[in-house]
């Protein structure tokens, strides 16, 4: 029996998000369309409700609890998202100590929302999130090659151990997707990103909202 054949069935799986989607890989992750746009301004999801900075791209580099409501009720927020320049797909967490199935589920959720936004004429830059090598097989599935991708480095490279995992994951993603542009939310030191720039990849770096706020407090 399939869900679509059940009368008066509440769509608890949010199947409407992937209507007419094509899927990639054994996990059937929704595929996204190519996006080559380059954002010039970012705004966190939590601030879009009182903002008129519609020339910004919305990002989700925040605690999951802040934007879980988008997954719970995406139709409610669509008109607001459509006002802005575009969206970087949701950054649902992939912690290394999370069960792998939860990491896969969060990757699916991000892609499903991204696909749905694209079908509603919202430009979407895919966010790539990985944990350790277990997540490599699916972290970039469904993402077109040679486009623009986004990566969050905030909180991932300060600690030596975390930095190693980040570098390994980034290298895998770049080799797999061969992007033209990488949007980096957080610091983008040349020790990590320099070799990609030398190979012709454009790095577009944005300071994290935390670092911007902290620098203002320190300088005040």
Model-derived features: positions:
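Non-catalytic, usually N-terminal nucleic-acid engagement modules in DNA/RNA processing proteins
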Residues: 9-78, 98, 176, 193-194
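C-terminal accessory extensions appended to soluble enzyme cores
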Residues: 1-32, 198-220
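Eukaryote-skewed repeat-based solenoidal scaffolds used as protein-protein interaction platforms
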Residues: 49-50, 70-215
